[in-house]
Amino acid sequence: DTSISEEAKLTIADSSYITVGSGGSIEELDETRYRVPHTLFVANSDSSPAANLEVSLELQTTEVIVGDSWTYLEGWLAPVSTTDCTVGPDTDELYSSATIVPSGDTDSGENSGSVQVITDDQGYADFDVIYPRSLGSWSRVEVLASADVGDLYPSRASLDFTLPVPSEILTEESTVPFQTSPFGEEGDTDCSNI
């Protein structure tokens, strides 16, 4: 029947996709801090790079680890006598363990949990996660990236990881640096103080 006529309005929005990653390298920033370089890539729905796009980055501590590392005759073992304690949004600031900054920024000032970066013409933006050496292997964090495409279509991505310790320390040291978690010893493994 050709007398039936209907009309449907569609809204077509450009969509973007974010990928967050790291090359796995750890740099000694100074005598007290490590820096882990990261990058993000944003692609449009047609897979072309999303150039000059502002991306918001947020860093949250999701877990702290309490307990001790073990030492034996040939070296030391990664933390084994431990408990992972979840850090909720209401206590994240109390256990904030790292700072997120644009790549190359070493003057992070206050412990910053958020930053904005702009993608280059290839859709990439670099940033660093900086943290005290004493927290390596004792804290788990999550990087959240988001970018708005239009008013209703935010794109999001995340990456979570345990703050790493350089492999040279793992192989060269006969005793573990920072053997006891700064968040609590083996006897405190019930997470009641977290």
What are these model-derived regions, one by one?
Residues 1-56, 60-99, 133-134, 138-142, ...:
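Short S/T/G/P-enriched beta-strand
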Residues 35-36, 111-113:
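Short, small/polar residue-rich loop motifs at catalytic or cofactor-binding pockets
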Residues 28, 110-111:
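Generic detector of short alpha-helix boundary/capping microenvironments
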Residues 44-45, 114-116:
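Generic recognition of flexible, low-complexity loop/linker segments
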Residues 1, 104-108, 115-121, 125-135:
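Short, hydrophobic beta-strand segments
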